[in-house]
Amino acid sequence: MTVLIDGRAAVRPELGGVERWARELCARLPALRPDRYAVARPPAALAHRAGHAWEQGVLPFRARRAALLLGPANLAPVAFPRNVVVIHDAAVLREPGWYSAAYARWHGALLPAIARGAKRVITVSAFSARELRELAGVEAAVVAGGVDARFTPGADPGPARAALGLEGPYVLCVASRIARKNLAALYETGARLAARGIDLVAAGGERPQFRAARAPATGPRDLGPVPDAHLPGLYAGASAFVLPSLYEGFGLPCLEAMACGTTVVAADAAALPETCGDAALYADPHDPAAIANAVERALDPSTSQGLLAAALERAAAFTWDATARGVDAVIDELLGTDSTMHAMHAKR
């Protein structure tokens, strides 16, 4: 074994973009190179515990014989000298007010320390690479995320509709209940759409370390966290998908919706135009009226049919196998250029 992967985020009960990345890398890298990769999973007592006992305490000991330690979910042991870390965005540095005060203080110091001490930083978009260069003073290799083959226009919406109580047509948003997802604008957009007879439903869980807007009495229906098995059908059954985020390091739900043949309305902000390309409609995230108007355009059959081929082609360009190969190429470069480190640990 040459490279140990931190598997903590892969076993978290919540499932956002970071956790999806961790799960996919923990599965695909050992399959790609079984002689190179192994996964370190925390014991049950530490797997879901708040704090950093695993990353900063147990994990460095587990990785002591590894040539490299790969952290796929923003975190790595600060004192470990052979980290490769995937940092998905620099949101905590760009806008600390999106987070609880304690989280912003701790991670605002921890993220730059991890990044500057790493052998290599990987990030998920050119946008995030620019943010890390500006705010943390580090260069990052860009490796985009992927879309699982489960997300397809043929996904059956029936089980998701039945389980979640969805009867009529709906517009979907999949996003955690955190401030940078622009929930205030989403809720106002939902109210505007409801006045026009359009139902907006929102799926995603809360994270206590992040600040979030409170849902008003009128607005989108809140589904809460949705089981992963229902997501493809939920996307495929939607009349349109909307993600009005102020800040995304990548924007994976947009690609998942595209892969299911659902027209996407995205904020023209952060990494979303980079990820979605010309396969989505865009709106100013600060203007709920513009978002609602873009959703209405997405519901027009002539618009949605015009975007369908581009959306399917765009989503097909992002695969988790390609992500794994991209990360492995970064590891190859490190092990190949640092031959002394590689030889030393190969002998152990």
Where are these regions (language model features)?
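Carbohydrate transferase catalytic cores enriched for Leloir-type hexosyltransferases
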Residues: 1-348
